[in-house]
């Protein structure tokens, strides 16, 4: 134990359990709800896990395409726990797509989802979103 008091940046329980965050843009367009866990930019173990995932998915280069893929993989496997995506109201055959990290990478790589990926990654790295007062009642789910 250190002789110094250093406050915790996040509630460990909230950071691991995740928080549900809705995404509605400035124009009022709803992009769904996303359950995010805290992605700590200072956690060395998490940084190593990112590198392992990038290597596994073959995106270790510094090409722009690989940067996008690395961001999508990091968020899909380490930050995103679940989602409730909107369905196309004009398509009667539209189905709910359950969350999987593989589908999340595909979704987050879509050129039309760049803003979603960016907004979700920003929130997943924002420690103010993962404080003790943000605990949700998981017994309802």
At which residue positions do the language-model features occur?
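Short acidic-hydrophobic surface loop/beta-edge motif
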Residues: 16-29
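Residues that cap or initiate secondary-structure elements
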Residues: 9-10, 27, 42
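Short, surface-exposed, charged amphipathic helix/loop patches that serve as local interaction elements
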Residues: 30-141
């Amino acid at each position: 134990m250190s002789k110094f008091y250093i406050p915790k940046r996040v509630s460990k329980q909230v950071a691991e359990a995740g928080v549900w965050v809705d995404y509605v843009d400035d124009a009022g367009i709803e992009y769904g709800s996303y359950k995010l866990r805290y992605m700590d930019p200072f956690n060395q173990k998490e940084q190593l896990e990112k590198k392992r995932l990038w290597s596994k998915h073959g995106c270790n280069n510094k090409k722009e395409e690989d940067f996008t893929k690395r961001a999508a993989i990091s968020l899909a496997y380490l930050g995103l726990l679940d989602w409730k995506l909107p369905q196309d109201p004009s398509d009667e055959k539209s189905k709910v797509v359950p969350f999987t990290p593989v589908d999340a990478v595909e979704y987050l790589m879509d050129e039309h989802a760049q803003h979603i990926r960016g907004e979700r990654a920003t929130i997943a790295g924002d420690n103010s979103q993962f404080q003790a007062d943000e605990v949700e009642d998981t017994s309802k789910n």
